[in-house]
Amino acid sequence: VVVNILVLHGMNRPGVNESVRENFEQLFNDAQLTYHLAFLEGDTQTLKQVVELLISKGIKHFNIIPILLFPAKHYFEDIPNILKDIKRNYPPMNYIIAEPLGTHQTISNIVKNKIANTLIKNDKVQTVVLLAHGSSTYTEPRQAVQHLAQSCDVFGIPIQTVLLYGAGNYVEHLEKILKQYPQTLIVPLFLRDGYLVQRTKQNIRQQAFAENVTFASAINFVPDLAKVIKDRINELEVLANVCYAS
């Protein structure tokens, strides 16, 4: 038996993880999909707790699906380190980690739909800025966001990228963009319009030249996200059939 574990960032703020859990129940309401949710932050249902509970029930093989758009510290360090620690205490355990969600073509389609829907309502938009979390340590998030921007470059206006952290930081770059393109559409590349997105929007609105900025919504568990996650699970199931055949 191979068990699917969807690993989310989570938060220590009261009620946030419960709200996300409800989002997933709605997302997969009609899908024939068996999975367990685990969180990197929070006191309950942590990745360690979920895996160790399943091991105590006799499960040895796990498909780990990070519900992260782009690869950074959580993907390269936190999730693997937690799993390595568990395996150190329980050597028979095996796991495979899926790719992040942001490289899936459907994510590009979701973002393009958000841009197109805004341009229908506002034909004055001069440029689109994709806003992502980024990383102060890893270059992979910036590369992935730039690749996504290239795939979204179908509207005849410039598609640009800024990050919250690392090279391409929005504090450094956004004012220049807004000065050149006052009518800017900003698309937050986040799974939900949570605390970080709201705080960043507030900071941007206080910047110079930001009076004509338009914000699209974050991905916010649109139905197509279910396809992305199911495809990542299917990819792992193919690998699992090979890896766990013995």
Regions found by a protein language model. Give the residues of each.
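Active-site-proximal alpha-helix that buttresses catalytic centers in soluble enzyme cores
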Residues: 1-246
